[in-house]
């Protein structure tokens, strides 16, 4: 007999090293293809054991841009990172909604991001199926909201 977990919500965190990207030639087109692959990774992979899995939009992106007025120094800052990753991830909160005992949908969760506390030198973007919206939540996405 197959075991079945009727519903699960997974949070996935990924990182791209600016230094390694420069060494390997990883560029904006590679990034676009990666985001497209993430959005579609379950569309052609349904099975009896996994049921129906999907990626819920938007992907939340943090981009280090630096703060210095000197362009060379700003690029250096951006490559090193302007804030620790764990501090950026702490800005995103996902919690089961009050009154929901057994969640059966991602809509049974409240998802929020604290846009007021994005560190200086960091930009936040939201990758939807339509593209990336930088600095604000996309109007066509209603699951995430500003904390």
Located regions from the model:
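Basic polyanion-binding and macromolecular-assembly surfaces
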Residues: 1-147
């Amino acid at each position: 007999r197959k075991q079945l977990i009727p519903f699960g919500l997974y949070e996935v965190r990924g990182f791209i090293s600016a230094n390694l990207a420069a060494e390997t030639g990883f560029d904006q087109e590679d990034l676009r293809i990666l985001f497209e692959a993430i959005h579609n990774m379950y569309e052609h992979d349904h099975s009896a054991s996994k049921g129906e899995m999907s990626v819920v939009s938007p992907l939340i992106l943090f981009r280090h841009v630096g703060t210095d007025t000197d362009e060379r120094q700003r690029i250096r800052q951006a490559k090193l990172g302007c804030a620790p990753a764990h501090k950026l991830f702490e800005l995103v909160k996902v919690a089961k909604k009050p009154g929901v005992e057994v969640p059966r949908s991602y809509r049974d969760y409240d998802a929020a991001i604290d846009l007021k506390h994005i560190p200086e030198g960091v930009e936040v973007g939201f990758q939807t199926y339509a593209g990336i919206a930088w600095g604000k939540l996309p109007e066509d996405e209603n699951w995430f909201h500003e904390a």
